[in-house]
Design a protein with these regions (language model features):
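Short beta->alpha junction loops
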Residues: 77-84, 178-186
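Small/aliphatic-rich secondary-structure junction motif
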Residues: 1-48, 113-159, 165-178, 187, ...
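Structured cytosolic domains appended to multi-pass membrane proteins
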Residues: 37-123
């Protein structure tokens, strides 16, 4: 039994001209994609009014992107939201659809190698579920990357990554496609960004608060300068309600 399809949220500001980047459909061919078209409207504008005015245009774009994702093999669900607050909307959809990850959409003409940046043990199962779910059948090279923390020896890092590797192999990724790499750095984000340059896509967790700011807190131009490819941000498990 292969891994189930991981659910990935793809938020696009459709009316700002944001489209599905080149290669996204191939990257997410084995996913269940929640394609979120959103448009941020001024406080004083009612969402119903915005929907009446722009809904049709936005929906036709969204459907075009959904068709491209489906043609590559993904299961797709579309949502169109007019909102006063983008972050809250994205968060709500992650929760409603139980999304394993959110895609920061950048183009990836082809994905041959993925950097999986792992900090701590929290939520590791979610990372491996995503990586195996997306890439088990794709022949992609996977690099598991860990920046050692305070008081952690290189051996600790290696044994941590060894466990992650075994989990991936169990989930269907060929062991000869997995490399492990442990580095020491005072600036983990810089280290990740530097490593990312030699890969086509990055998978990282949101458990490290600086990661979320790295992805959503900086203007996307800055991320694009640091890393030009797509970033999959694995969400932490939500407390059961």
């Amino acid at each position: 039994l292969g891994p189930g399809r991981p659910t990935v949220l793809v938020p696009l500001a459709v009316l700002e001209g944001e489209s599905l980047p080149n290669g996204t459909a191939e990257l997410l061919a084995n996913a269940r994609v929640v394609l979120l078209g959103y448009h941020v409207i001024p406080e004083q504008t009612a969402t119903e009014q915005a929907r009446e005015q722009f809904g049709e245009t936005a929906m036709s774009k969204l459907e075009e992107f959904a068709a491209a994702l489906a043609a590559a093999g993904a299961d797709v669900e579309t949502r169109l939201v007019f909102t006063h607050d983008e972050a809250t909307t994205i968060d709500r959809l992650i929760y409603e659809h139980d999304c394993l990850a959110v895609l920061v959409p950048n183009s990836a003409p082809q994905v041959d190698s993925v950097l999986v940046a792992l900090r701590g043990t929290v939520g590791i199962g979610r990372n491996t579920r995503l990586v195996a779910g997306l890439f088990a059948d794709a022949g992609v090279a996977v690099t598991l990357y860990h920046v050692s923390g305070e008081g952690e020896s290189p051996e600790d890092g290696e044994s941590f990554l060894g466990g992650v590797r075994s989990d991936l192999v169990e989930r269907g990724i060929a062991s000869d496609r997995i490399e492990t790499l442990v580095e020491d750095s005072d600036a983990p984000l810089d280290a990740i960004a530097d490593r990312a340059e030699s890969h086509d896509a990055v998978v990282m967790g949101e458990t490290d608060p600086s990661v979320t700011t790295f992805v959503f807190g900086m203007p996307s131009e800055q991320i694009a300068e640091r890393f030009l490819g797509p970033v999959l941000v694995v969400q932490r498990a939500r407390p059961e309600e």
